């Protein structure tokens, strides 16, 4: 079985998202990535997810962990996974340069302490489910019902798409200030919860996951233009092995001390 995704197509999707999203804001990136992936047929969605996993796994080596520690004030297994999601979203050139030497990350506009993008690693899952939900809403007459009840809020199918996307990507956001918007949100959430589709991607992935030959073929294509990673231990002095990134972080720290944190700032 060949996966319906190539490295060039994968990175072209990432580039389209980067051209539209606020790349300092994970929420913005997730929404634009979701919208792009919703356009893909299911086999390409699976391929995109497999390519994402492959690139994320490839970036797992000690010096990259050190870079994550400098940028995010430490790391862990889960936090490092989330950091590599952010890394992928920086695009092919940035990813490749970081694979050559993680110190090259210093050339990027880095949102220090905010590059652990957990949600981006799950967007293929959400997009697959979103496709299923749109079909379900239409087939069961839910879409027509919602359009009748909320004509001021749902003026097109794009508005319903937005409502479903928000419940998938940001289910725990603050309550709406307008009663009608909150009621629409509550109904959309109810229909998603009762659809039985929330975890449909798990079944799809299990039934269609690539075999060893397909994985090997895919990865030989993906990694052909990437450097070979040498086995090494975790560096002891980050400032020595990643001097440019270390200096950039120190400069960022110094700049922050010049101003008091704004009210409500988390970190």
Residue ranges and their predicted role:
Residues 256-267:
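Non-Sec secretion/translocation targeting segments of pathogen effectors
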Residues 31, 35-114, 170-173:
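Core of folded catalytic or high-affinity ligand/protein-binding domains
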Residues 95-97, 101-242, 246-248:
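Basic, alpha-helical nucleic-acid-binding regions used in initiation and control of genome expression
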């Amino acid at each position: 079985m060949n996966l319906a995704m190539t490295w060039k197509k994968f990175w072209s999707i990432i580039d389209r998202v980067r051209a539209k999203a606020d790349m300092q804001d994970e929420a913005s990136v997730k929404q634009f990535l979701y919208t792009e992936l919703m356009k893909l047929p299911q086999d390409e969605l699976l391929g995109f997810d497999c390519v994402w996993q492959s690139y994320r796994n490839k970036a797992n080596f000690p010096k990259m962990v050190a870079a994550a520690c400098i940028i995010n004030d430490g790391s862990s297994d889960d936090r490092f996974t989330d950091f590599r999601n952010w890394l992928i979203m920086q695009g092919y050139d940035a990813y490749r340069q970081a694979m050559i030497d993680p110190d090259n990350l210093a050339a990027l506009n880095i949102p220090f302490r905010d590059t652990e993008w957990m949600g981006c690693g799950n967007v293929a899952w959400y997009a697959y489910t979103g496709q299923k939900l749109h079909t379900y809403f239409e087939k069961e007459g839910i879409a027509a019902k919602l359009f009748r009840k909320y004509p001021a809020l749902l003026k097109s199918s794009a508005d319903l798409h937005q409502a479903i996307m928000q419940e998938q990507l940001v289910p725990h956001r603050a309550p709406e200030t307008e009663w009608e918007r909150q009621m629409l949100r509550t109904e959309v959430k109810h229909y998603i919860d009762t659809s039985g589709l929330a975890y449909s991607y798990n079944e799809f992935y299990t039934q269609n996951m690539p075999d060893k030959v397909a994985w090997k073929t895919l990865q030989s294509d993906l990694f052909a233009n990437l450097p070979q990673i040498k086995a090494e231990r975790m560096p002891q002095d980050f400032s020595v092995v990643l001097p440019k990134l270390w200096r950039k972080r120190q400069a960022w720290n110094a700049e922050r001390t010049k101003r008091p944190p704004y009210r409500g700032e988390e970190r």
